[in-house]
Amino acid sequence: QGVAYAAKCYGCKATIVMPTTTPLIKVNRTKSYGADVVLYGDVYDEACAHAYELAEKHGYTFIHPFDDLTVATGQGTIAMEIFKELPLVEYILVPIGGGGLATGVSTLAKLLNPKIKVIGVEPAGANCMQASFKAGKVTTLPAVNTIADGTAVKTPGEKIFPYIQKNLDDII
């Protein structure tokens, strides 16, 4: 929805590819910003692969939702907001799907306070980052099973994984 909103603000056209299992409220909200929505695949990974194919075929700019350091950096500003509201915070729990949000938040949090503990949280049925974290390398789950569609990812981001390894203290 963020890309759709930004495209609307800048008068750009956006095509957003989402899994067929995406809740209708998210699909409708994305469309309300003027984006074209393509429903494809049963899980995020299939939708992402299709989005990349569309970008290649039509010359679109592909914006990865989590495996993009620029996107993760922007998401990291959440850590600044946390420290502004709670300057003595000792722990931050951050949700993980593909890892972009956790990368941004944990990286900036550790820069602002190297002693802070940042814990990633994933659904048990979609714990691709936890599996990767434990294995020391990006790992693909055979399947995902969660109602939390925003975290239903089989393979976490390759580009952001080193930041996860460096800046997350644990993943539960």
Task: For every predicted segment, state its role.
Residues 4-10, 67-167:
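Glycine-rich phosphate/pyrophosphate-binding loop at beta-loop-alpha junctions
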Residues 33, 60-66, 144:
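Short beta-strands and strand-loop turn motifs
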